Amino acid sequence: MFVQEEKIFAGKVLRLHICAADGSEWLEEATEDTSVEKLKESCLKHGAHGSLEDPKNVTHHKLIHAASERVLSDSKTILEENIQDQDVLLLIKKRAPSPIPKMADVSAEEKKKQEQKAPDKDAILRATANLPACSTDRTAVQTTMRDFQTELRKILVSLIEVAQKLLALNPDAVELFKKANAMLDEDEDERVDETALRQLTEMGFPESRASKALRLNHMSVPQAMEWLIEHSEDPAIDTPLPGHAAQAEASAAAATSSSSSEAAVGTSVEDEESRDELTEIFKKIRRKKEFRADARAVISLMEMGFDEKEVIDALRVNNNQQNAACEWLLGDRKPSPEELDQGIDPNSPLFQAILDNPVVQLGLTNPKTLLAFEDMLENPLNSTQWMNDPETGPVMLQISRIFQTLNRT
């Protein structure tokens, strides 16, 4: 019987876990004396897009040892790279280096920039010297827009107070809001996807780093994996996200204070006890719906030199919009965070018109409406969700119509 020479002297066969950038995984078998380049070719045949007839396709990819975060050399063998059985390797496409521009291209680009350059102040004055003077009160326009946003928030603050008083008269209110409180306990906004976390930890990444990467990349495994590789040498990679630990401490302290206050109620009239209990539940719900600053925006603004508390205040005032928050920090910082919690004047025509509306009156007796107001107060971007809700949508529509009508008059 004839046996090929390479099979007689073949090394130990290893089973390797290969993970591609698109999230696909498979097992690849290779001997210890197989070169990294041959292993890469085999991996590309299995899971890469494009044709292997193009020799550049192999050179455009690289294999990374997940546990040690090393890029494997194509010229070395698996044994020389100290790869063990059941190790995890990542198949990643290399980033193409930016081509060096030619001198002719540089001069043409500079000429194009000069042609497209905006005119300076002197050029504008010369071009508009013969035009009649015209002034526009831009400040008034900006103030109107700011007043619209501010008044809408003030309306929600005042309506929440009214809804709480109305619902306190409902004998079933405590049970209803206990259920709402339990539902908020199951809120998964701050939880990390366990499946995604397990995928990254199985690749060899520490759990704390994997959790941080998933939060920064909206639970996307491929993006989180790239972030971990790019920031592997970053000394701040193990630093927790800004505001994350602070929120946990605040919620723990709040839970302790609420439990102690509940224990101190003692013996009193049954109606007073239910009102006190309802008040505590309202406080818990509001704490759980507290504003959550966008982690990436916080990091970006703090890198500019702003204090973490100032950054979170700016993002809260500007609904997590990073550019608007930056302008707020650099400007006069109006409105202030304290102004956001002030309600509208209860004797104002606007508030009286809203309370006199039958649809609003009926909606204020619905616990779901109160939860919707609380959510929109701290997360204004969720307004669309509540506008489309069959129970809260009609209430929001009436409030919007009344505001727009009185705002125009």
UniProtKB/Swiss-Prot annotation:
Residues 14-98 form the Ubiquitin-like domain. Keywords: Acetylation, Cytoplasm, Repeat, Ubl conjugation pathway. SMART domains: STI1, UBA. Residues 187-231, 292-332 form the UBA domain. The keyword Repeat applies. Its main location: cytoplasm. Residues 357-396 form the STI1 domain. Pathway: Protein modification; protein ubiquitination. Residues 235-273 are annotated as: Disordered. It is found in: Cytoplasm. Residues 245-264 have a biased composition (Low complexity). GO terms for cellular component: cytoplasm; ubiquitin ligase complex. The keyword Repeat applies. InterPro entries: STI1_HS-bd (IPR006636), UBA (IPR015940), UBA-like_sf (IPR009060), UBA1_UBAC1 (IPR041926), UBA2_UBAC1 (IPR041927), UBAC1 (IPR052476), Ubiquitin-like_domsf (IPR029071). GO terms for molecular function: polyubiquitin modification-dependent protein binding; proteasome binding. GO terms for biological process: protein maturation; protein ubiquitination. Non-catalytic component of the KPC complex, a E3 ubiquitin-protein ligase complex that mediates polyubiquitination of target proteins, such as CDKN1B and NFKB1. The KPC complex catalyzes polyubiquitination and proteasome-mediated degradation of CDKN1B during G1 phase of the cell cycle. The KPC complex also acts as a key regulator of the NF-kappa-B signaling by promoting maturation of the NFKB1 component of NF-kappa-B by catalyzing ubiquitination of the NFKB1 p105 precursor. Component of the KPC complex composed of RNF123/KPC1 and UBAC1/KPC2. Interacts (via ubiquitin-like domain) with RNF123. Interacts (via ubiquitin-like and UBA domains) with the proteasome via its N-terminal domain. The UBA domains recognize and bind polyubiquitinated proteins. This is Ubiquitin-associated domain-containing protein 1. The gene is Ubac1.
